[in-house]
A protein has these predicted regions:
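Membrane-interface loop-to-helix entry segments
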Residues: 102, 117, 130-160, 335-342
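Membrane helical hairpin/interfacial module
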Residues: 22-116, 125
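Membrane-interface "cap" regions at the ends of multi-pass membrane proteins
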Residues: 1-27, 33-35, 205-206, 351, ...
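Hydrophobic, membrane-embedded alpha-helices of multi-pass small-molecule transporters
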Residues: 6-24, 40, 44, 87-91, ...
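Selective recognition of specific alpha-helical transmembrane segments in multi-pass small-molecule
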Residues: 42-54, 87-95, 127-128, 148-163, ...
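Membrane-interface interhelical connector segments
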Residues: 237-267
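Hydrophobic alpha-helical segments and their helix-loop junctions in multi-pass secondary transporters
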Residues: 92-95, 99, 131, 148-174, ...
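Membrane-water interface regions at transmembrane-helix termini and the short interhelical loops
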Residues: 31, 107, 124-145, 205-209, ...
């Protein structure tokens, strides 16, 4: 079994957490939390990290086996199978939502005349091939994407800081505290980070000497910094009212800058940051779902499921919502509660295992 190192996992978690959130969920959280969005992201990051650590604690109970296999020893086979199907369904639902975000983004900004179905099929083919390549390929992709993102951010940050920002607004982050808005924003941000509980499903691929708590903390911290690096400038450039009504406030912020006559806009560079990172996230979600389904079906090789499951994700993404506004409303109003319910399921296993005592995650000796 090929293993993932600690540094690879940090990069993978960083890209996985920040990619979609920085690109598409900035506007919803600004609309919800206003100036309290920064605090909401920080609190959400801490709570989401606790969810991830709970999932990792369950995975450590049987480090050599997949959660889809050893979970039945904890709660029983007929309880475990419906729960693992729920979790696999959630991950595929999440992958479909992310893919729909990519489709809408490309259609609005770069491919307005291309049929959505064509874009979805091409994205699905990319995901299927990535999933078939295995977790090691996904981890190596994360390394490349991480350093490309880091390089572009280093290059673009000085240029973007040249845009006039309303720096007096910084005081509002402290003076405009609202408990209700902060709580609502925290509820919305927590599943952003809690989504990294996917590590539970790939734990056997991690090197055994990895200190998972330290890795998860660094992944959450790095992704939090990256998300805030998009969120704060968007707030200072447009204010909470206007930024909350924009579909892609970060894109509008970048478009407001011109560099002489040879680069009219920097938004293609932003696309370079978004799309590969999001495809990595979708691929990891599909991989985790496929590997779990393969174990439930007692398949020795998960690869035959890669194309069929990816095709299902493509079909669902096309019919996920009628338009971008409806998609944003779903992500703001309904998805956080649904996501938290799914992400908290591993905690049920943790409680049952603690009650049953040591060895609960291993088969009983005959």
């Amino acid at each position: 079994m090929k293993h993932i190192s600690a540094s690879q996992l940090v990069m993978l978690l960083t890209i996985y957490i920040y990619s979609e959130n920085a690109g598409f969920l900035i506007s919803p959280i600004i609309k919800t939390a206003s100036y309290n969005a920064v605090l909401a992201v920080i609190l959400g990051g801490v709570l989401g990290l606790l969810i991830v650590l709970a999932g990792a604690a369950v995975a450590r109970m049987n480090e050599r086996e997949y959660f889809a296999v050893f979970g039945k020893y904890i709660v029983g086979k007929w309880v475990h199978i419906p729960l693992i199907l729920l979790l696999a369904g959630y991950m595929l639902h999440r992958a479909s939502m992310s893919m729909r975000n990519v489709e809408d983004f490309l259609m609005v900004n770069h491919l307005p005349t291309t049929p959505e179905t064509v874009i979805a099929i091409l994205l699905g083919l990319t995901v299927a091939l990535t999933v078939r390549s295995g977790i090691q390929a996904i981890a190596r992709m994360a390394e490349v994407i991480f350093f490309v993102n880091l390089l572009l951010l280093i290059i673009l940050t000085p240029l973007l800081l040249g845009i006039e920002l309303q720096t007096p607004m910084l005081r509002a982050f402290v003076t405009n505290f609202d408990l209700n808005r902060t709580a609502a924003g925290t509820l919305q941000a927590t599943p952003w980070f809690g989504d990294a509980f996917v590590v539970l499903f790939i734990y056997p691929h991690l090197k055994q000497q990895i200190k998972i708590r330290r890795v998860a903390v660094w992944g959450a911290v790095f992704s939090m910094i990256l998300i805030l690096s998009y969120l704060v400038p968007s707030l200072l450039a447009f204010g909470p009212e206007l930024a909350g009504k924009m579909t892609y406030p970060v894109m509008e912020y970048v478009r407001s800058m011109r560099i002489a006559d040879f680069i009219e806009t920097l938004d293609p560079f932003l696309t370079i940051l978004y799309i590969p990172a999001l495809m990595l996230k979708i691929s990891l979600l599909v991989y985790a779902a496929v590997i779990s389904l393969a174990r439930i079906l007692s398949l020795h090789d998960y690869k035959p499921l890669a194309f069929s499951v990816s095709a299902a994700v493509v079909g669902y993404s096309v019919h996920f919502a009628d338009n971008t506004a409806e998609l944003l409303y779903f992500m703001t109003a309904y998805w956080p509660s649904y996501a938290l319910c799914m992400q908290l399921i591993p905690i049920l296993y943790w409680f049952v295992a603690k009650i049953r005592g040591k060895g609960a995650a291993h088969p009983k000796a005959p």
